[in-house]
Amino acid sequence: MKKVIILLVASFCLTMTAKTGPKDSKTTFAKEALQPYVDSGQLAGAISVFYKDGVQETCCIGYADVAKKRPIKMDNVFMQCSQTKGFCGVTIAKLVEEGKLSLDDPVSKYLPEFKELWVQDGQNDSVRTFHKAKNVLTVRMVLNHTGGFPFEISAKRGDVRGGGWSGGAPIRQTASIAAASPILFEPGTRETYSNTGIDIGAAIVETITGMKWEKYLKQEVLDPLGMKSTWFWPTDKQLKKKIELYATKKDAPAEWREEMDMEQRPYNDSHVFASAGAGL
């Protein structure tokens, strides 16, 4: 089936994926659509790729750094944030295709610590009440955000700083913390956006393959696609090409989010772990 994909990567959503790929084609399809937003200041900058049976058009619009008037370029690096979840989905899908996994398998088949879960009923003053989960947690549930896990589970523990892209813990440790923590509702009954669930999915990949999730991702997905600059720990050279992080406001210029943890954190420090929920 033919696909037409327009990918707009705006500079308020950093992505550590840039590589020397197609050059700016200097064509006008996206530029005509996006330039007014750059001119008004609502959009700091963007890279567009128009794809139909191959790359038809690429265009760079605006700035990687508004204050310094540094133009955005095809080789700038961005942080993907939650788009990392899709990469985890690909690794799961590969195992499903190979017959090594079913989406309706219990998570406890691969991670026994999830066999018994506790649901938090509520909290009155300092007293919290729980009940043993009645529903079986499946692989599908942790991937589609219906497992009952909060956005960042490791941030709830005082012995682990942050969670996911903000520090957190290795995949298997994050999964173990999640299994030992109360969930928000019965698995499969509601939905809440969760990096934790995706990290649990990555932990399942580690169990089946016997490899660290990030190494499996690199070997089976990133390297075959030629995504040489896509990784959890960018080099100092890559960081010199990163775009600044901006927030958008309706009818107002984009503002640099100076106090934003994602912008201020050391991207390649030793405490940064390969979160499947938001690490690339």
Short names for language-model regions:
Residues 1-23:
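Bacterial Sec-dependent N-terminal signal peptides
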Residues 21, 82, 221:
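Conserved catalytic cores of very large enzyme subunits
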Residues 23-79, 100, 116-122, 179-180, ...:
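Short, conserved catalytic-motif segment at the N-terminal edge
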Residues 29, 102-106, 212-217:
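Alpha-helix N-cap and coil->helix boundary residues
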Residues 34, 53-56, 76-107, 198-206:
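Active-site SXXK
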Residues 58, 118-280:
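Short, surface-exposed loop or secondary-structure junction motifs
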